[in-house]
A protein has these predicted regions:
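C-terminal globular interaction/adhesion domains in large, modular proteins
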Residues: 1-173, 180-204, 208, 215-293
Length: 293
């Protein structure tokens, strides 16, 4: 944990763990403790298998490449995207709704790369959406890249993007528009788990808010580098309310001033006792004493 709120934390001193680190209780109310135990992202493999089973049995599993043939658990069975250029060749776009449902469209084309990096932005998609109820167990599993936005109200869902092979594939989750709760007292919860990266794309909103607990299993949470020759190379503000777990270094901005100028990261305390459905954790909180005055 490091802070740039004045006075800035000292630079790393070469020791592991660092020595003579100031307490900074004004920023870290519970203090700072070094070192922390390493948690391997490989431990998620078993969780992903469980999510797949839950989606297949009583949740929703979308497999555009299989289209209900090679993967009989997939819905809808009339979605044929196996051929290049198919209706969901690039992935799926989900818009969550406030009536405990969601709209889903196949994404057929994305904007071209810029500065040698993927735009992670939709150029064309199906005009008509298909609408589904959020399943009772809250699990939605997509076997392709996902774009997601919208707003929920009294809903809870964990949504995963994992392509074949499940261990070693490269599906991403892209966040280019607001993804919001209505209730901020714990009734609403969204979990997002990406096989690789969780991105804010080149054409992401100038001001964007994402309410979710987010995991990037093998990649990073952030935004690709887009130089000054790219459209939207500078964005204003991104706010994430929830939690971040990223295998590689997080970042929505770069040292040359590109990317999001303001990054607000706010931990959702309700995740402690009311996480999204079946969301992975490394343990549970316990009360060791209680004192009423």
């Amino acid at each position: 944990m490091h802070t740039h709120l004045p006075p800035l934390d000292p630079l790393p001193d070469g020791n592991n763990p660092p020595q003579n680190v100031p307490e900074r209780s004004d920023v870290f109310a519970a203090g700072r403790s070094f070192p922390s135990n390493i948690v391997s992202f490989d431990l998620l493999d078993n969780h992903i298998n469980i999510f797949y089973q839950l989606a297949s049995s009583s949740g929703l599993l979308f497999d555009g490449a299989a289209a209900g043939a090679a993967d009989p658990d997939s819905v809808p069975d009339y979605w044929g995207c196996a051929a290049p250029g198919g209706a969901c060749d690039e992935g799926f776009h989900i818009t969550l709704r406030s009536d405990n449902r969601f709209d889903i469209r196949g994404v057929s084309q994305v904007y071209p790369d810029c500065s040698g990096n993927k735009s992670n932005s939709i150029l064309s998609q199906e005009a008509a959406a298909r609408t589904y109820d959020i399943p009772a167990n809250g699990i939605i599993f997509l076997k392709n890249t996902l774009w997601i936005d919208g707003q929920i109200n009294n809903s809870r869902a964990t949504i995963l993007a994992f392509a074949e092979p499940i261990v070693g594939g490269e599906a991403d989750i892209n966040l280019n528009n607001d993804l919001l709760y209505t209730d901020y007292e714990g009734a609403d919860a969204i979990g997002l788990i990406a096989q690789r990266d969780v991105n804010a794309g080149q054409y992401s909103a100038d001001i964007i808010r994402v309410d979710a607990a987010i995991i990037a299993k093998t990649g990073r949470i952030g935004r690709n580098y887009y130089g000054s020759a790219c459209a939207n190379y500078i964005r204003s503000t991104i706010t994430i309310y929830g939690s971040l777990a990223t295998s590689q270094r997080y970042g929505f901005a770069y040292t040359d001033g590109t990317g999001y100028q303001i990054r607000n990261l706010i931990y959702d305390n309700h995740l402690t006792f009311s996480p999204p459905p079946h969301y992975p954790s490394t343990g549970e909180y316990t009360f060791i004493s209680w004192d009423e005055k």
